[in-house]
């Protein structure tokens, strides 16, 4: 079952990206290197509720 998640920047805490994930394949919280337009750089983004 795919669920909607939001990715938040770890530097400025802005919620920049919405995506989906398969909870069966990825039960843990996702972490991705993404571009933050507020920090103007690539930063680590973590899954939020």
UniProtKB/Swiss-Prot annotation:
<dbReference type="GO" id="GO:0005840">
    <property type="term" value="C:ribosome"/>
</dbReference>
<dbReference type="GO" id="GO:0006412">
    <property type="term" value="P:translation"/>
</dbReference>
<dbReference type="GO" id="GO:1990904">
    <property type="term" value="C:ribonucleoprotein complex"/>
</dbReference>
<dbReference type="InterPro" id="IPR001705">
    <property type="entry name" value="Ribosomal_bL33"/>
</dbReference>
<dbReference type="GO" id="GO:0005737">
    <property type="term" value="C:cytoplasm"/>
</dbReference>
<dbReference type="InterPro" id="IPR011332">
    <property type="entry name" value="Ribosomal_zn-bd"/>
</dbReference>
<dbReference type="InterPro" id="IPR018264">
    <property type="entry name" value="Ribosomal_bL33_CS"/>
</dbReference>
<keyword id="KW-0687">Ribonucleoprotein</keyword>
<dbReference type="InterPro" id="IPR038584">
    <property type="entry name" value="Ribosomal_bL33_sf"/>
</dbReference>
<protein>
    <recommendedName>
        <fullName>Large ribosomal subunit protein bL33</fullName>
    </recommendedName>
</protein>
<dbReference type="GO" id="GO:0003735">
    <property type="term" value="F:structural constituent of ribosome"/>
</dbReference>
<comment type="similarity">
    <text>Belongs to the bacterial ribosomal protein bL33 family.</text>
</comment>
<keyword id="KW-0689">Ribosomal protein</keyword>
<dbReference type="Pfam" id="PF00471">
    <property type="entry name" value="Ribosomal_L33"/>
</dbReference>
């Amino acid at each position: 079952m795919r669920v909607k998640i939001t990715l938040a920047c770890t530097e400025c805490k802005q919620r920049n990206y919405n995506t989906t994930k398969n909870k069966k394949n990825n039960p843990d919280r996702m972490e991705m290197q993404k571009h933050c337009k507020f920090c103007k750089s690539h930063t680590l983004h973590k899954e939020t509720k």
